[in-house]
Structure formats: structure tokens, C-alpha cells
Amino acid sequence: PLFNSCDFISRVLQSCINQTLKDIEILIIDDKSKDNSLNMVLEFAKKDPRIKIFQNEENLGTFASRNLGVLHSSSDFIMFLDSDDFLTPDACEIAFKEMKKGFDLLCFDAFVHRVKTKQFYRFKQDEVFNQKEFLDFLSKQRHFCWSVWAKCFRKDMILKIFEKVKIDERLSYGEDVLFCYIYFMFCEKIAVFKTCIYHYEFNPNGRYENKNQEILNQNYQDKKKSNEIIKRLSREFLFDEFHQKLFEVLEREEKSLCMRANKI
């Protein structure tokens, strides 16, 4: 998804163009950007036919934009990339090689660039799980692995998500949790790797760190909506122990967002 990212878009596109695996699609979903980022992408697209640009008729938010990107894709495997982040050069090659082994989902580690560069998840070792084992693994992690970045998904399984939730649901916060939650419920074979394939750039003006009152209020409303959808869908899946732990985390996050929105 692309929205007002002119400060970062050249770097992220260059990281895609320079992938060691050349047979890839680079899909850009412009969510009504108001800066020069779309024009910058158009210049890149003139030089690389793998770059395909789609423009939303109105601002739809991150969740809907990603979903529309999936529908426009022709690949069996999908990776998501935020416009202020970037990939390691071999990210697609590593993911493609592993997905060909029959996995439903790959989870990788990522570098986080803040004051210092650190590994985000810090997985101790490479592991393969069935669904129950993976949900147990998630429950014990410091971070629940909810981000859609640093993962590789199967397109046919993503389409199952669209049977459970509106494709154009307007969400720009809490959307990763909703997407991954539904996807995890369909997974049977999952691999976790300690290899870092993704660079997450700390952006003080980004959605998650922004202190603007209007954005904070919208973040809270989006998170609340996401949690409500997850709780409604949870009745369809029989993982009571996992859901109990999950709801504790989600409610804590929602309460924290509410406090941030009311504090400023």
C-alpha cells in the first residue's frame, strides 16, 4: 500500500527491484496519496515492467488496499511490504524456496531500526509447526507475531479470509491482527525462521507512533472494530485456551490506545 511516502518510496522500490529472485510482481496500491510519491512510482514503473500500479478511487485504508493488491496479483505466494520499510536482497528467493516445500505460512525475523538496529522477534531457532503447535508457540512469544510483514502467505488461503470479513473493511490500525488471526485459523503447516528478511523503519510520523489527536482517536476506533470482528469470528474456531490468551492481549492493547487517545 502507498500513502504519502515520498521520503521512503525510492528505497523500498529499489529493495524490490534488486531482489535476487527476478520473477516477481511488484504491486503498488495508491490510497489517494497527496504528496509526490505516486509520481515517483510512475517513474520507476517506466523502467521496470514488474511494477504495476493500481489507484483507489477514494482513501480506503491499509487493510482494504492490501486486500485489493492480493486480488490484482497473479502469483501463488504473497508478501506484504509497507512503504517506509524495505527487504533484504534475498528475501523473495528465500521465501519462494521454502513455500515450494508445501508450507501454508512462513514467519521470518526482522531488523527494527530505531535508536539502534535490533532483531524484532529474536526467534531462537528454525522450527516447523502444525496449527496447534503454532498457536501454542504464539501464546508464549513476547510479541504475538501479528505483523503481516516478514511473512509469506499463500494466495488461495488469503482468499479464504475474504469469505469471513469484508474486503474493503476500512482499517488502518489493528488490521494486521485481524488479517493474521483469520489466516492462522486456516493454517496446517507453518515454518518459523530466525533469518531476518525485512527491515522495519521506525517512523515517528507513522501510524503507530503518531501523537496527532485525530489519528490517535482513529487508531483506537480501528483497534476496537478489529477486536470486535475477531471476537465474533472466534466462535467458529475451537481453540479456547489460545483465544483466552489472545483476548487478554487484545483488550490490554485496546485499553492502552484508549488511554493514549484521552491523555493528549
Residue ranges of predicted features:
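A conserved acidic beta->alpha catalytic loop
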Residues: 30-40, 58
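Donor-binding/catalytic cores of nucleotide-activated saccharide
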Residues: 62, 83-191, 198-217
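Conserved short acidic donor-positioning loop in nucleotide-sugar-dependent glycosyltransferases
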Residues: 16, 31-32, 60, 83
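Short loop->beta transition adjacent to catalytic acidic/histidine clusters or analogous donor-positioning motifs
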Residues: 17-28, 36, 48-52
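Short aromatic/hydrophobic "clamp" motif used to bind/position activated sugar donors
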Residues: 78
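Glycine-rich, basic loop-to-helix element that forms the pyrophosphate-binding segment
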Residues: 56-73
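C-terminal subregions of glycosyltransferases and related glycan-biosynthesis enzymes
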Residues: 147, 171-172, 192, 196-264
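Short, well-formed alpha-helical segments that are part of the catalytic scaffolds
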Residues: 4-18
